Design a protein with these regions (language model features):
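Metal-dependent nucleotidyltransferase catalytic core
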Residues: 1-22, 36-91
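A nucleotide- and high-energy phosphate-metabolite-utilizing enzyme signature
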Residues: 1-13, 23, 102-107, 186, ...
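Conserved NTP/Mg2+-binding pocket subregion across the NTase superfamily
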Residues: 3, 7, 65-152, 156
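Short gly/ser-rich loop at a beta-strand->alpha-helix junction or flexible surface loop bordering the NTP-binding
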Residues: 27-36
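Short acidic/histidine-centered micro-motifs embedded in hydrophobic/aromatic stretches
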Residues: 33, 101, 209
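Conserved nucleotidyltransferase catalytic core and NTase-mimicking acidic/glycine-rich helix/loop elements
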Residues: 115-243
């Protein structure tokens, strides 16, 4: 996990103390993790695992929420430890991302012996890939071919495209295993080219549009055409993948 500032570390320690006060001996652990996308990098995300969780516990946390947010923390995801383990198959991408990239703030290691079934990851990736493809097709029709609108569509879709490729990188690969530490754009692009065969240059162009803005795209329609074909190839890869 990327390093957090000393201020955020202090805020996480304070959060852990608050949760220990609420849950007492039922507190299991608090882990910090980066957001799945890049739209909320100003807040530090965390997962709190406890033995039992009820309405009274949530109500007891209410007076502390504003303070957490003022210190730059997102409201923590609070789950029962057993609940987390039982729903790994329901949220394989979300929980798999936390397993792959986290830092323990306080408590025991809650992930010892825990793994996400690669087949669950594949099914979730297939849904994500097909949804992305459908939304791009629909979005292109809505642009009516207007170049600026096409550029906006590409830029708006870059973050979910990046997330999709990052999730796919965690699927075991026969020749190279899984790439669970692929986070930077350049690494995401290179892994997509190696594994799926889509152009790393194309991936970098699409991802760059999210940060540099759609005005940086010289020929939006030409880029979109290649982008759409690449997403079709991504879906075909995930559809055919087998553990």
């Amino acid at each position: 996990m990327p390093a957090v500032s000393s201020a955020h570390r202090a805020a996480l320690d304070a959060l852990a103390t608050d949760l220990e006060r609420v849950f007492g001996a039922r507190f299991v652990s608090l882990v910090a993790y980066p957001p799945a996308g890049r739209d909320d990098e100003t807040h530090v995300h965390s997962l709190a695992l406890v033995e039992t969780l009820g309405f009274a516990d949530l109500h007891a946390c209410l007076p502390m929420v504003a303070g957490w947010q003022r210190r730059g923390l997102a409201v923590p995801l609070v789950l029962e430890d057993a609940e987390f383990r039982r729903t790994l198959d329901v949220f394989p991408l979300e929980y798999g991302g936390i397993l792959a990239n986290h830092a323990i703030v306080r408590g025991r290691n809650p992930f010892a012996g825990v793994r996400v079934d690669p087949n669950d990851v594949r099914r979730a990736c297939e849904l994500q890939a097909k949804s992305h493809l459908i939304h791009l097709r629909e979005g292109y029709l809505e642009t009516q071919g207007e170049a600026a609108a096409v550029a906006r569509l590409i830029a708006a879709s870059a973050a979910p495209f990046r997330a999709l490729l990052t999730h796919i990188a965690r699927l075991p690969d026969a020749s190279h295993g899984s790439a669970e530490n692929v986070y930077e754009d350049a690494a995401v692009a290179e892994e997509a080219e190696r594994r799926i065969g889509i152009s790393a240059t194309l991936v970098r162009e699409v991802l760059a549009s999210a940060t540099s803005g759609q005005t940086s795209i010289a020929d939006p329609t030409a880029l979109f055409s290649r982008y759409l074909a690449a997403v079709e190839q991504v879906w075909e890869y995930v559809d055919a993948w087998r553990a």
